[in-house]
Amino acid sequence: MHPLDNVIWQALTTRQAQFAEAYGDARRFDPAVTQLTAFLEPNPKGYASLAHLVGPGDTALLSLANRYEPQPGWELVLTFPGLQMVCEDGGNMADGLTGSHTRAFSPPSIVELGPPDSLEMVNLADLTKPGPFGPRTHELGTYLGIRCKGKLIAMAGERLKVPGYTEVSAVCTHPEHIGKGYARALMLEIMRSIRQRGEITFLHVRQTNARAVELYERLGFCTRKVVHFTVLRKCKD
């Protein structure tokens, strides 16, 4: 199996196993870290295992290879197609970010974010909706941000990690500052760090988010496959 196939499962059983809650053929991150959940296979055993991890009325966010098919005991809350994109050509960004994927740009100072910034990070994610982001998501990897007059206005960071690959995630900019190149600047810094570790950068994005997809393609990302992000709620007894 390729490391990016069933990538949430692979993260929770390899490089990020320390964050996993496990039962049978199911895994999920500690909900304070992220709502991402996975099973070995989307079969009755997988859903039965998942039912032991998710309480009645609670939700699970899955990334499925195929469209969700109704399962006993589960209510479909939301599903939408996404793209898994990979930047194999990361070499152009090493040592000063020279190459075809870069252009002159001088953003405000980029700062590393951590526990003291958690509330601001959650608030920015709640406003801009880049994907699930919890009070401990920053523990998954390096997160960088840009501030304006002391206020966090843009951020990006690392989320899923599997052998040889790290995901860039939570790429978002406050609506009042969109179009200034902040997301691009932050992504380049995260991608450079990943490349320096000898890893390949990947990401996930809504298939309908044309603005983001265009940015990622300019940075050298290519679509690897379509995935189906699916939110399920466990039915109450």
Task: Please give the residue ranges for each predicted region.
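A conserved beta-strand-loop-helix scaffold within acyl/acetyltransferase catalytic domains
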Residues: 132-172
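Conserved active-site alpha-helix within GNAT-family acetyltransferase domains
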Residues: 69-74, 184, 207-225
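Short amphipathic alpha-helix that is part of the acyltransferase structural core
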Residues: 1-4, 92-131
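Conserved beta-strand-loop-alpha-helix junction that forms the acyl-donor binding cleft
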Residues: 62-67, 193, 202-213, 229-237
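Acyl-donor-binding surface of acyltransferase catalytic domains
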Residues: 1-22, 26-102
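A short, internal acetyl-CoA/4′-phosphopantetheine-binding micro-motif in the GNAT/acyltransferase core
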Residues: 37-38, 171-178
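Conserved acetyl-CoA-binding loop-helix of GNAT-fold acetyltransferases
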Residues: 45-50, 179-194, 213-218
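Conserved catalytic-core motifs of GNAT/GCN5-like acyltransferases
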Residues: 77-87, 222-236
